[in-house]
Amino acid sequence: MKDGYDLTERFNRAFQVYYGGRAAEVAAAYREFVHSMPLAGITISGIFLSHSLPGDSDLPSFDAGIVRRTLTDADYQRNGSVYKMVWGRSQSEQTLATLSKFWWADVFICGHQAQESGYGRLGKNMLILDSSHNHGVLLPLVLEKQYTMDDLVQALVPLAGVE
């Protein structure tokens, strides 16, 4: 639900409107495409990049091995680890510390959580980027370079300034 609307229902209805009799075929192609996307990446310097991370309440049943194994249909279900990683919010410093140990990550860069100024810091090692509005930012990285959180914040570029 977002703004009182079931987005899944709207999405499915749009497939029927735009693709008619081919809706199921196109939906299957979308599903295959989305399932082919990587869940995360990690740089040699320990920067973990993902859409989101599991929230505090999801961590006890979360399988951190999903980034290193073949995913199953169960992983994508509402109680599955992919779902928890993609839709997670409200990570505490303890959750970030636990995930950092799982994945040998020093810093997390994620999105998924609205940030009025285009970015926000969560704890000492998570940077949240939001490019969905006119204060959005991007973050150029040198993948083998070691960064502090302050370095990352200093490197942010406002999207409004990109030509």
Kindly give the residue locations of the regions a language model identified:
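Feature recognizes metal-dependent phosphohydrolase scaffolds
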Residues: 1-163
